[in-house]
Amino acid sequence: GIYAAYSAAREGADVILLENDDNIGGMHVQGNVQGYYYGAKGGTYEEDDKMCFSNDVYIGKGTFPFLKQSLYTKRLSDIGVNLLCGYTPTGVVFDEIRAIGLCALDGEKIINIGAKMIVDATSDGHIIRMTNVPKKYGREIDGKTVPFTVRTQFMKDGIYVAVNTDSGFLNQYDAREFSKK
């Protein structure tokens, strides 16, 4: 989502980035994913990771979520992206044949946003799931959903440390199975 917003704004589009949480960034920021495009070289994410590793403000070195959030928020604001944090998409507005806007709720009020284009960069396609487009969940080979990882963050010897712990496969749409992990 952050890279789609940044790229569109860089090309001159008026961009609104809706974020459900209080901070921007999904898997790349909050999930602290490093490396994209199956290891291909190049891309804005590489510039950002280098920028994070060169920081001298935060405890520890690396691409920590809170560092990414502050750097990316500044980058997007500087290029003119309108950041709306704390909003949940509640509906898609259609004309005869295409999506032309979104409705979103911030907990108190509903806003309506007209759009020439909508990019659904949510974790599980939350916006597309509001439409009547046929959907299919899980992998083609076995119907299983994606692996789930728990990211633990702590201080060790005065240094901020983050560890990914693979929790195995689970069905994130099953509340009982999800809550056991």
Where are these regions (language model features)?
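N-terminal Rossmann-like FAD-binding beta1-loop-alpha1 element of flavoenzymes
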Residues: 1-16
